[in-house]
């Protein structure tokens, strides 16, 4: 059997859009067939039917009304599908044979612009990634077609670089080079929910000069080859999906990866910059506190500022000074916010104009917005800060565009462009004439109705109109007997009435409909001319929109600072940050006012480089560390900060390792995830970075974890290429011994008060390490049953009594294992039981220490007695040195530490 002509046409079109659900226009419906129909029926909960198609079996089919298509398209796109819109591209009345059809647009997650599904305050980005394996380089291009933003960058071909940029922009769609490393593709897939497509190298490399020159003109000539190729693929993809060149995408913003603070995916999540960890919503994030902007453009800009803090001191200072000027003039800032309030989303209106789908109401919104600009400009006219002066100087009042729209478009125009009622009286003479004819015709219709009522005596007679039957005279059945014979021609029969026409009414109908059709057509054409004229000035409009967005951000930061008692920070590049009475801006917002406990911070490249913070769970260690990072970040976006005084050293990167969970999809355990994050930090942090490390090593055995944490601290402080400013929270109290041992390490703890066997968290960071973790007390606060709490105390007491013997036995095994390593192969893990051969004199020494260590707690510790100098110890006198340890001055844990040090030295001497 042969396919029907319509089905043959369907398959010819579908062949070019295999990765899309094809919406095939048939009359007033979009129909889907075969697999597309099955998918759409399942996802949209539509009834799946069938249609004869010329094959043995009917084609599965489902459909939706074209006038309700937006909601269905939005639901499919939100689920990650692409939708190809296939329209009838010729009038069925004049078509010879089957009506011509073609795809007029492909709608994808990254190119969907319908306001019902795109968040006003978030960009809808699409990204392309190009890689050059030989040069080990990559480039990325990013755009939001609804706003016209187009950015590009390049850097080393490293997983971290790519994943960081993906986490920053959070694109809805990513186009990858299909030869990209498979492991990297897997990591990208696990990192983002974006729809991922893969394209051959030709898609990136062919005709890039031609494509970019057509889109950007001479501006593209100065781009690097790498950026040209990623940008080429992105522009091609836009052309492939939108089927037109978008004029609002007219410039490329090339940025360097070092222009902004680096914040990796883990840190963005842990710091909750734009969404909270639990619900993934804005509430509870830093953006939630800071965003009191007046415009959608300003809100998107502020989000971008938070995602991309500055690292240039001069640029930060420019923003801070502008915020300060508005902060100090409350009346001025109130006036500015009021003026900004009525400005619509100019960027997205321009996106609609560029995409040829802006209606008359969009142009009225644009006119209203432009009309506010002179007032905005006047408000900041006398400002003295450099940034505000620049805004005033560069702000175009767009008077010519305002006047065009003011005299041309009706204030309350029709939503449908082809239904007329768009253009103001007096703008076009021909439109005025047609309207007069239409008005006269309607007056004639009204007079006809009155005449016929008088002639027939039927008071309920009326003259009406509908698009199917045109004009008619309607008489109810109750008045049939009053109808003069031969006066009317029957046109339509209803249940309770009859509709008629007269030759005279038919004649005027033709004149009226002719005038109406011509009027609607003429208004549509003139509207397109006006819209095109506005589009010719899209460069000016985009520049103005950007200034308004930035001005909104500055005004907003001044308002938020006043509302939340923030202060202007000082900035330095000396490596030292001092914060007095710092507060966490989000936490203080969600707890009762006045209950947040502020804390001081001093962190630098010298004696306060790595702060070891100890204290019980729930005491506030993590909040404090996040607070320091967020205050630093706020300063670098140009915001005032929550403190009484702050002098912030500019940081190039913020890293956090706070909390972890299994990465089951990636095949990584909690501990593996933790170690991967620590590894990433140690490889990429610099001396100008800020690092937050929380409970490093807790995902494995106690001694393995302690060893790793200890080693990480040493590496950070002693590696001259690293030495980053670090906040290190831990429950390993043994690490507090590193103060004085390693330059730059300082101990801090969270103050706790004990009252009647209960603990009170004071939330205050104080100098010195904590002497216990209060784990059982925290468990009690969490509601663990008393029976469990009491038993835990008994077990803890027993373990503390036995800890010395157990730990020293463990150390003894390591000493003997080190001896065996010289003779045979490497040893098993330190916590495994194994037989060892020990010389009798060694056994006697160790047993003596074990027998006496349980009483050691009663002896006072003197720091100078427990410091050992191993620099001159050799193999021959190692045992002698061990025997000389003054066990009476050591408690059990200190004895363990000393033996661990001896074991380490023994291994080094092998």
From Swiss-Prot:
Function text: This protein is involved in the repair of mismatches in DNA. It is possible that it carries out the mismatch recognition step. This protein has a weak ATPase activity.
Gene Ontology CC entries for this record: cytosol
Annotated InterPro entries: DNA_mismatch_repair_MutS (IPR005748), DNA_mismatch_repair_MutS-lik_N (IPR007695), DNA_mismatch_repair_MutS/MSH (IPR017261), DNA_mismatch_repair_MutS_C (IPR000432), DNA_mismatch_repair_MutS_clamp (IPR007861), DNA_mismatch_repair_MutS_core (IPR007696), DNA_mismatch_repair_MutS_N (IPR016151), DNA_mismatch_repair_MutS_sf (IPR036187)
SMART domains hit by this protein: MUTSac, MUTSd
Residues that, per the record, bind ATP: 615-622
Pfam families referenced in this protein's UniProt entry, alphabetically: MutS_I (PF01624), MutS_II (PF05188), MutS_III (PF05192), MutS_IV (PF05190), MutS_V (PF00488)
Organism of provenance: Clostridium perfringens (strain SM101 / Type A)
SUPFAM superfamilies linked to this entry: DNA repair protein MutS, domain I, DNA repair protein MutS, domain II, DNA repair protein MutS, domain III, P-loop containing nucleoside triphosphate hydrolases
Encoding gene per record: mutS
Keyword annotations: ATP-binding, DNA damage, DNA repair, DNA-binding, Nucleotide-binding
GO term, biological process aspect, one: mismatch repair
The name this protein goes by in its record: DNA mismatch repair protein MutS
Highest taxon listed in the record's lineage: Bacteria
Keyword Nucleotide-binding in record: yes
Keyword Plastid set for record: no
Similarity remark: Belongs to the DNA mismatch repair MutS family.
A GO molecular-function descriptor: damaged DNA binding
First and last residue of the signal peptide: none
